[in-house]
Amino acid sequence: MKSKFTFLKLFLGCISLLIISNKFISNAKGEELLKVELHNEIKKGKFLIGLKQYLGGENDSFSEKKNINFTTNKGFLNLISSNGIKHKSKQINITWADIPVKNPKTIERIVFGPFASYESAKKQSEKLRDKGFETTVAYPKNWEVWIPFQDDLPEFELKNKIFRKIKNFQITPVLRNDYSGMKLEGPIYIYSEEKIKINGVNFGKNFYLIRDLYGTWTLVQKIEFDDYLAGVLPYEIGPNSPLEALKAQAVIARTWGIFNSDRFNMDKYHLCISTQCQVYKPSKISNKNVQKAIEATSNLILTYGNQPINAFYHGSNGGVSATAGEAWQIQDYSYFNSIIDGSKSLNKIFKLPITNESYLNNFLDFDKEQFYGSNHSLFRWNKKISSLEIKEKLIKNKLININDDVLDLNSTERGSSGRVTKLEIQTNKVNKSIVLVKDDIRRVLNFIPSNLFTINKLSDDLWLLRGGGFGHGVGLSQAGAIEMAELGFSYEQILNHYYRDAKLENIELLSQ
């Protein structure tokens, strides 16, 4: 049963409001002042997507020349800068200049992290807020939590996490033509009635350049929900997936995007385009099945308690799904349960929780054809790892130094699905063991496809990991959804299978 309700009701108190600028000319005619509010764009059915991050800085890899070139085949491009500059032409070229600061200032903060995921960073942020700290969840390269620097730090350990940097210059965008350049101020709005190419790639019609927390810039695209999904589905589940699986993916990608639309509010946009959000690339060729799936589910999302759910999904669960609390250092959501993902007969053979390695080995050895999604290339996997490989990863993550050696590897805690939630790595340093928890296991040992594995010691410096699945294992398994669709399940049945007690709701967007 699908019901309707307005976005205003749905999001009352759910997503924080953030005004980008109250001096920003951004309607199609470029004549009216308009407040661009992240929350209001969502209510209108639009995402602000961070296409390219860290522009103008050391990590700017958008082009070799460190510039952005906007072109259009028809009509004109319009640029409006917050310092009053307006420009109209067939081509706009923006470069970056390091402008010296008259009064250099020292930036100081206390940094916690890195964290493997936004979810774990947000949980740390909440813990610090409960202690009275003002926090910011940021993503300079990895997820971090920042609190303001204080001379009188309440905990000694904080003194090891101080970040200091003197700001001598400011990265400034410059509008270039054949003869000169004009300094611009953000936000900068670039739009056209026709599609715009950026560095030779077709994107859309509405873009912003916005300064981020790190002194660099982000290229942001404003895009309708369904146009965004057309660039997500082909790269998340594949354009040739069965139609019902594509429909299920469309619903959860839309739901996930809405629920997580405050993920980058510190940098004044909603979502990124990498696996830290949902993989998005501009749609070059329209795929009929992808479009059918999006149109058939337009404005449909999954809700629980009249709010959108955090619709996690992944590649393969290896035959058993995880709870959110197994994957990240967060509280569980009631709509996620560990389930044996396959035929009903499997639930008679295997009972949850899977508490020990012997039971998990039996599970991994069982006939995989009875599970949904067993065709995935990593549904079952074996990985030999040496002490040297582990050591290299620990050094890279600054957990040990070059003189330390790895002696042993043990799982000390498992979740209800059998996934490792605590991994102890013993070293030759007296009383020195490294304990990796939940998503940090795969962040540090990133050669492990999932946390569903057993450990078998082959020699003093070699272990065999036997495992299943690819990804965190929470929510919909894309491989499972594809097989369920091939077996004749509808997208509603697929969603109900992976998100118990969640409701399919039809949202009503505010008028444009």
Q: Over which residues does each language-model region extend?
A:
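Conserved, single-site charged/polar hotspot
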Residues: 2-512
